[in-house]
Amino acid sequence: MVQSNSLSGKRILVTGGAGFIGSNIVDELVKNGSETVVLDDFSTPSVTKFSQDVKVIEGSVENLDICRLATKNCDFVLHLAAVSRVGLSEDNIARCSATNIVGTQNLLLASVENNIKKLVYSASSSYYGNQESPHIESMESEFLNFYALSKATGEELCRFFSNKYGLGTIVLRYFNVYGPRLPIDGPYGLVIGNFLSRKKEGKPLIIHGDGNQRRDFVHVDDVIKANFIAAQNNIKFGIYNIGSGVNYSINELAEMFDSKLEYSDRRPGDSDITLANIDLAKKDLGWAPKVALHEGILKLISEI
């Protein structure tokens, strides 16, 4: 599993720590002896039960004073708090802006004031839109939705605070993350989560569009590892793709579930292809994904 021994004894703030990726990160930090603080507004349902060793602050990154409180005496910040679905962001642009843009600004301000050693910002492959793949970090942005714009604005805030105030910030552009605690229900559930839910219920899998859209899926264990490496390196600022470097069509993904299929209208704002070029993360961070998609999917299916 993920190793973070050099983070043992360090005080680490995880914003959005009750969410899918954040809660998995918190579990690993606790296992490895880190003093862990969670900041989350619990605005989305969470089944996470934190260890008694975790300090939980219920509040929003939209509140600067709460960000100051949460970052006090911390060594590192792993910033995952966000309105993190395309559909949700389009339905409520004002909230998306307040959380993803103003919230990130608040956390950066508080991190400077409290002398945080490194902030790791969870960004998104939505930055690339429908550009030709594979996607490389030096590409210009192409925003298909407000969520993509809001997350890219957070990247630029990280760059500014690094240049202006010397705050170490690393931006990780996640591709399609999956694993334990993946959202499974509702219109904004992630595709693998929705597939798992419907397979468990014995229902046909719903594919939006023709199923030829291609996605680069990366396991949450590999994302955790990327966060831990990013927090500990000496790079003052950098942007890195965190994906598998391989993509699959939604039809190919569905075949792994051995279920009946139904097709419906494609969702607006979805990209055609995501595919990460991960050469820079390998070179600068020494990071590479380890969990193959077939392996990860079979394990998830065995647990439903």
Language-model-derived ranges and their functions:
Residues 133, 146, 156-215, 220-225, ...:
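NAD(P)-dependent short-chain dehydrogenase/reductase
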Residues 85, 124-127, 131, 187, ...:
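Activation loop
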Residues 5, 200-304:
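C-terminal substrate-binding subdomain of Rossmann-fold SDR/epimerase-dehydratase oxidoreductases
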Residues 1-175, 304:
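N-terminal Rossmann-like NAD(P)+-binding domain of SDR-like oxidoreductases, especially those catalyzing
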Residues 18-21, 61, 105, 131, ...:
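Gly/Ser/Thr-rich beta-alpha loop segments that engage phosphate groups in nucleotides
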Residues 24, 66-69, 73-76, 106, ...:
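Alpha-helical elements of Rossmann-like donor-binding domains used by nucleotide-donor carbohydrate transfer enzymes
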